[in-house]
Amino acid sequence: MASHDHDHDHHHHHSHDDGDHHHSHHQDGSHGGGGGSWVGEDGRVWHSHDGLAPHSHEPIYSPGDFSKRAPPLISRRFAERAFTVGIGGPVGTGKTALMLALCRSLREKYSLAAVTNDIFTKEDGEFLIKHGALPEERIRAVETGGCPHAAIREDISINLGPLEELSNLCKADLLLCESGGDNLAANFSRELADYIIYIIDVSGGDKIPRKGGPGITQADLLIINKTDLAPAVGADLAVMERDALRMREGGPFVFAQVKHGVGVEEIVNHILQAWEIATGNKRR
């Protein structure tokens, strides 16, 4: 099992799906605090933001392939942290609305808890509490600072801590983790998410699926949201379907209108199927 030291006093090293990442954590704080960048001993350019440990990013040379996506971790102990669903996607595509819809669909039969990521606020967590998605004690809001993708990939401890705490506190069956809004290159580490959902919407036009990026090509499930807006923005859903199938090599995707409940049942079925396979449990 992949392990993380939540203390972060000094160097630690852990393996991610596409290579090793070395995080240099300086005791003297010389590279923390207000940010900045520098060249590390490994030759990579490192940077830091308020609230996050120094980190570097692996260069991305291609959008990736669905068939070559990182598999779920074999040695996961769900007694230590429940099956975790990662929900990523650009700002405004409907991640928080999906979190709310999933909570409403699953909370009667399953013990749930949720962690939200925002860059400088706790707005998404507060939204879930305000709308009664789950009891307040089952929700944690994390402020990631200016590099939201690091919190779901390079320096996941900021999310692992709350997820593990909630998992034990709530005896959770499922954990939901919403990333901060980011670009098409951002995707979850398998050390954090057992099942990865990436959500885009049609407001950017029908070109988005073919632009690719790890989220679109390698998420376990792609959601194309707000299909009701297609006529207004001139997006052709047939083109989006064709491109999604091609970019994802036939991997699953769902057309949805999450706010109106369209496609939510199909999304829930995908999640529960993965949960059953990973945990050996039967859906209720």
UniProtKB/Swiss-Prot annotation:
Any one Gene Ontology biological process term?
A: urea catabolic process
Task: Spell out the molecular function terms from Gene Ontology.
Answer: GTP binding; GTPase activity; nickel cation binding
Superkingdom to which the source organism belongs? Eukaryota
Question: What segment(s) does the record annotate as region Disordered?
Answer: 1-51
Tell me which CDD domains the record gives: UreG (cd05540)
Q: Give the UniProt keywords, A-Z.
A: Chaperone, GTP-binding, Nickel insertion, Nucleotide-binding
The yes or no answer to whether the keyword Ubl conjugation is present is no
User: Which residue ranges have biased composition labelled Basic and acidic residues?
Assistant: 15-29, 41-51
Q: Which residues bind GTP?
A: 89-96
User: What biological function has been recorded for the protein in this entry?
Assistant: Required for the maturation and activation of urease via the functional incorporation of the urease nickel metallocenter.
HAMAP family in the cross-refs:
UreG
PANTHER family, per this entry? UREASE ACCESSORY PROTEIN G (PTHR31715:SF0)
Which proteins does it associate with, and in what oligomeric form? URED, UREF and UREG may form a complex that acts as a GTP-hydrolysis-dependent molecular chaperone, activating the urease apoprotein.
Task: Identify its protein family.
Answer: Belongs to the SIMIBI class G3E GTPase family. UreG subfamily.
* Name the record gives this protein: Urease accessory protein G
- Origin species, per record, is Oryza sativa subsp. japonica
Q: What is the lineage of its organism?
A: Eukaryota, Viridiplantae, Streptophyta, Embryophyta, Tracheophyta
